[in-house]
Amino acid sequence: MIFISINPFALKRFFFFFLAAIGLSCVSCFGQCVLLGVKTTPYDGQMSRIRWVLTADVPEGRDKVSLGMVNRWIGDLRSIPYGFKKEWKTPTETQSGSPADCKAKAVALYDRMQIHGATNLRLIVGKRTATSRSTHAWLEWDTPNGTYVLDPTINWKAYQGRDVGRRSYIPLYAFEGTRKFRAAPATLMAQN
């Protein structure tokens, strides 16, 4: 008769390795998401002051918004000192020069771009990095040249979405006009 002894410590290491492998395989889904339409988000109450910015009509006959213009506007907003405020600031309050947070700067850029005729623009609330503890706000702009990430709080210019990396700018919620979205990993959608 042969007796086999299983060391409990080795079993714990096996389960730790197994859970680590599952966790690392899930990391690859960051940055790849599908936006699902929703009726409400946790931010609806806070955003009541700036809802009109998101739902404003884009003026007809405006000049095309260039990447150079957007980079200038990002630089202007980036130079405003950072200061967190729970309440969302209006674009006018942000332009006053008093400290503004990522929400205020993103909404001010959204407003300025829309006034000048930009379309296919989304306000995103999500994580700046996969390990961020707090949420962050930025814009995504779809153009014929690709999707741009516009973050006037962190960056001095626009970056193409493919250049920011898979572990950066991870959306949780998106707002485009009157439409609201919840981000879901693309891998979950592929399984259904």
Language-model segments: residues:
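Intrinsic disorder/low-complexity segments
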Residues: 9-11, 27, 31
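Basic side chains
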Residues: 12-13, 105
